[in-house]
A protein has these predicted regions:
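Short, small-residue-biased leader/transition segments that mark boundaries at the very start
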Residues: 1-7
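Hydrophobic alpha-helical hairpins/lids featuring a short glycine-rich hinge
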Residues: 64, 69-111, 117-118
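Catalytic alpha/beta core domains of metabolic enzymes, predominantly
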Residues: 149-152, 161-193
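Catalytic cores of alpha/beta
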Residues: 52-62, 123, 127-131, 182-193
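Glycine-rich anion/phosphate-binding loops
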Residues: 49-61, 85-98, 125-126
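Glycine-rich, proline-tolerant flexible connector loops at the mouths of alpha/beta enzymes
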Residues: 12-37, 41-51, 72-87, 115-120, ...
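Alpha-helix-loop-beta-strand connector modules within alpha/beta enzyme cores
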Residues: 23-48, 91-108, 112, 133, ...
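A structural motif
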Residues: 9-12, 67, 107-108, 140
Length: 193
């Protein structure tokens, strides 16, 4: 099979090729990307605390893959910002905004993978919305709402997605990224759209 045939037949618009710089296999994959009608996309994370977007070597590796589209994961759950990143919510919001502005300034289409969004919204809806608005306002074309733990029920996915749209992010700029830990991924995806 070829990725071009599969992406065309399935209607896939984007193919995420991995995280350049994360390991030799992912990095090598970007040296000779597949030829496809779908938009080839590099994945990475927002800039790290204490660094500028211009001087973060992890973000630079993603941009150096020279893909037309870059997808960055941004933490949207206050618990993970506090415990995993060990930074303030304000600093995380700034990191998100600066990272997406940097990607867009490089002439790339930007996708925000809003990590743990549904759990974050359940914990602190104002902050979860603040985080995705930071990406959107900085130029991210797409905001992918992530059910990273796969535990959000479909009716909650629908309600929260509606709240995101009501907060000012257009529905035609949203994506859904579900995990199937509780066998709800398909139903949750349908509820989101």
């Amino acid at each position: 099979w070829s990725s071009d045939v599969c992406s065309s037949d399935l209607g896939v618009d984007y193919i995420e090729g991995g995280w350049p710089g994360a390991n030799p296999t992912d990095s090598a994959f970007f040296d000779t990307p597949p030829r496809t009608r779908a938009t080839f996309t590099a994945f990475g994370m927002t800039k790290r605390a204490g660094m500028s977007a211009e001087n973060d070597d992890v973000l630079a590796a993603v941009l150096n893959a020279n893909t037309p589209t870059v997808c960055l994961v941004g933490k949207t759950h206050d618990f993970h910002v506090d415990r995993a990143l060990n930074i303030s919510l304000a600093e995380n919001t700034e990191n998100i905004a600066v990272s997406f502005a940097h990607v867009v300034a490089q002439g790339r289409e930007a996708i925000c993978d809003a990590e743990h969004f549904f759990d974050g919204y359940a914990s602190n809806p104002d902050y979860a919305l603040e985080a995705i608005h930071a990406a959107h306002d900085a130029g991210a074309r797409w905001i992918a709402l992530c059910d990273t733990n796969g535990g959000t029920l479909p009716h909650d996915v629908h309600r929260i997605t509606r709240a995101v749209i009501d907060s000012g992010i257009p529905g035609n700029r949203l994506g859904i990224h579900t995990h199937n830990d509780t066998e709800n991924a398909v139903a949750a995806s349908l509820a989101a759209v």
